[in-house]
């Protein structure tokens, strides 16, 4: 873990010193210890966390081994405290957690020590630059709970997707969740917000339609990019990924949306299950 002096230097980095794809708000988030320490308690009971776990489990199946008898490997990009990886490790998977937050990785390793026999691999890395990960070794790559949306600028989000494709085995599976900006149109002032966001994106090359900056857990400028379904499909396809299932989630992300009528407005988010081209 970083010393107090090193942590202070990290937290005070100038904006021009931040890694690609990392906004000031995201940097504040990943360098604030309290965010990681309180993460599990803060998010406990959120329905999406149970829903995505069940969907991942259903698609990956019960077997932790490949046809040659070796253990299957799962990589979680933006792993946080390891909520997706620890259940897989308990089944016998080998797991790799990737996060920009040293404090999140520390929480992940601490939890794993208490819950699983084999220690996971924990890697600090920028989601836009994952060259540290080898080609074709992962049976599953996860990027859940809108971790993709925390990456600033489209080219950096596509870079993450391309790396996910690259590290997958030939029959591996990529899971990704994003929030849906179409649901804005149902909110009071949502139409105006969408129009103003579109105009801002036209005038400011550093702003993209779907970008959002807001106060969050004591941080003044948390960043999140919120997708449309069409944008998500285009980015996955451009990154060499084939969508096998795209689940539209209900407004509260507690279950899969039923019916297709005005789904782009009714859905609170999307969970895509993909393979390589």
Regions found by a protein language model. Name each.
Residues 158-170:
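A short glycine-rich, Lys/Arg-flanked "PGG" loop and its adjoining helix->strand segment in the class I
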Residues 132-141:
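A short acidic, Gly/Pro-enriched loop at the edge of an enzyme's catalytic core
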Residues 82-129:
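Class I SAM-dependent methyltransferase SAM/SAH-binding core
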